[in-house]
Amino acid sequence: MSEAIEFSAWAHERARHFEWLAETMLPKPGQEPKRLVGAMRYAVLGGGKRIRPLLCYAAGEISRAPAERLDRAALALEFIHSYSLVHDDMPAMDNDTLRRGRPTTHVRYGEAEAMLAGDALQAEAFAVLAGIDDPAAGMRLVGTLARGAGVFGMCGGQSLDLAMVGEKPGEAELARMQSM
């Protein structure tokens, strides 16, 4: 079997497992507050390549990390990614109306509910990591995710992106933004 086929099978298996995990760990459909839960599920379960969870599983399997920690780390990464997409699609940012071939969360649920869904997904990402069976490992992961998503990470990069709207950034600006 070629390495490409082996990787493809591995990625497909992990992605299927991740879909089941996300479906299981998100609040259940119809659970109160129904619109918020619906918007959260819509944002996370709407498809996508699941690159972040796959990278998490790959790195974790290489380092022989426990499966439960890998699941929680992969879920936290995807929750952060989904929250960032929900916020990025909003009219105040990129004003996108389609994501993954369907209406964005704010188009489907309204701006206020989409904002709350993004906020709730961010909070859930940290709650998932805080629930890791080894509290010290969980806290290290919480800190790593907070730094990666915060002012000197993803949010900082988005701020730089917004500051350059209408401008043609140079290589230095692009490198700085991409490093965050």
Regions found by a protein language model. Name each.
Residues 1-3:
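N-terminal, positively charged, Ser/Thr/Ala/Gly-biased leader segments
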Residues 6, 13-26, 30-180:
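Mg2+-dependent prenyl diphosphate-binding active-site environment of isoprenoid biosynthetic enzymes
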